Design a protein with these regions (language model features):
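Charged low-complexity interaction tracts in eukaryotic proteins
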Residues: 6-8, 14-15, 20, 60-107
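Positively charged, polyanion-binding regions of nucleic-acid-associated proteins
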Residues: 8-39, 45-49
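Acidic-basic catalytic patches of nuclease active cores, encompassing PD-(D/E)XK
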Residues: 116-162
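Active-site metal-binding core of divalent-cation-utilizing nuclease and nuclease-like domains
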Residues: 149-181
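Domain-level recognition of nuclease-like catalytic cores that cleave nucleotide substrates
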Residues: 225-281
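Nucleic-acid nuclease catalytic cores
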Residues: 193-198, 212-242
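Conserved catalytic cores of phosphodiester-cleaving nucleases, focusing on short active-site segments
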Residues: 139, 174-178, 185-195, 207
Length: 281
């Protein structure tokens, strides 16, 4: 019974959020690719709709940025092949932006590259099997970012919450700094997802904005990672492209890795990796 009550409250709140965000969108709508609004408009919309004021107005925007799609009535106004997203433009200010429809997920036909597992046994014993924190931990201990980017990389911060001018509050799962053989410096903002989740453009946009603000002198290369199962995961390098004011999330590179015990990696497999490397070069 308690579960049903909780579920009904969640559905009711979702319905309120849909009505409020629809009101704000259509009150400002014009046939452009950018529509600005602020937090006070959310409060005004709830008042006009006779909806008791939501205590945490920011959760309305957060829901549509990271947890759910905007109502279909809003996306029906988008150009063919596009959808509306919400991006932060400052503290308490936002924009609806047109973006190509692109919820990215790992490819299903990639070779899994076996890597000897360097995760400490005590960490394996106590770390959860496949949540985002466990993924970040295994990637860090096995220096997967170094392998993927072919350079030396260092984790400097994880689960960072901060405020960026022109964006507002953001959270970055983990940040790596890297240096290549030519001495060029890079910053890699990482986002981790649990199995079944998809990568969206909003998170990548805010990661890039954060790095441009804090690490303006280095090259930013966003990374997405996701468990495929307990010991296999996908690593993707992403990029944002923009044409005619329409945003697009693209994948630059993708590799799948599998952590194994040393007995599970044969000499024949190692020879095959070498052959594949020679074929590529």
């Amino acid at each position: 019974l308690e579960w049903l009550i909780y579920e009904n409250k969640g559905l009711l709140m979702a319905s309120k959020y849909d009505k409020i965000i629809e009101k704000v969108f259509f009150d400002n709508y014009s046939k452009t690719s950018k529509i600005s609004f602020d937090r006070e408009e959310l409060a005004l919309a709830s008042k006009k709709l006779n909806i008791p004021r939501i205590k945490n107005l920011g959760d309305i925007v957060y829901s549509y940025r990271f947890r759910k799609d905007l109502p279909h009535t809003i996306n029906e106004t988008a150009r063919t092949g596009c959808e509306w997203i919400i991006v932060g433009t400052g503290i308490g200010s936002y924009e609806f932006r047109l973006s190509q429809i692109a919820k990215i997920e790992p490819a299903s036909n990639r070779q899994k590259i076996k890597i000897p597992d360097s995760t400490p046994e005590i960490v394996k014993m106590y770390a959860p099997a496949n949540d985002e924190q466990a993924l970040l931990t295994k990637v860090r201990y096995n220096r997967i970012i170094d392998l993927f980017m072919s350079m030396t990389c260092y984790s400097i911060q994880n689960h960072l919450r901060t405020t960026v001018n022109g964006i507002g509050q953001i959270e970055v799962d983990e940040i790596y700094l890297g240096i290549n053989k030519n001495g060029i410096h890079f910053v890699f903002p990482c986002q981790a997802k649990s199995p079944g989740d998809k990568f969206g453009i909003v998170q990548v946009l805010q990661d890039i904005s954060f790095c441009s603000s804090r690490y303006s002198s280095v090259i930013c290369r966003p990374i997405a990672m996701q468990f495929l199962n307990d010991n296999s995961f996908a690593i993707l390098e992403t990029r944002i492209e923009e044409e005619d004011n329409i945003l697009k999330l693209v994948v630059i590179d993708e590799k799948h890795y599998k952590l194994v015990n040393r007995d599970d990696l044969s000499h024949e497999e190692i020879k095959n990796y070498r052959k594949l490397s020679n074929d590529v070069t």
